[in-house]
Amino acid sequence: MGVAVRVVYCGAUGYKSKYLQLKKKLEDEFPGRLDICGEGTPQVTGFFEVLVAGKLVHSKKGGDGYVDTESKFLKLVAAIKAALAQG
């Protein structure tokens, strides 16, 4: 089993496509090494929260916005690499 990456997103806001784009990009970066799951909220929450190995790494509600820049993506990559190094 790979590193657990969990994305909680606002399903009612239509963020599923953003989740799927992020999932594909992470799978391309770490083929076969991640266990990615997404959960869309049925009510409007504005969520786009990314947890790596149970640790909150990215939070739209916390002011991070979407994972829409290379620097935001690299922050996730660094967290995943650290989790992989810990085994």
UniProtKB/Swiss-Prot annotation:
Entry annotated with the keyword Cytoplasm: yes
Primary location: cytoplasm
GO biological process: one example: response to selenium ion
GO molecular function terms noted in the UniProt entry: antioxidant activity
Subcellular location: Cytoplasm
A UniProt-annotated Pfam family: Rdx
Record's keyword terms, sorted: Antioxidant, Cytoplasm, Glutathionylation, Redox-active center, Selenocysteine
UniProt xrefs under InterPro entries: Selenoprotein_Rdx-typ, SelW_related, Thioredoxin-like_sf
Quaternary structure note: Interacts with DPYSL2, PRDX1, YWHAB, YWHAG, HSP70 and HSP90.
Protein's name in the database: Selenoprotein W
Native species: Sus scrofa
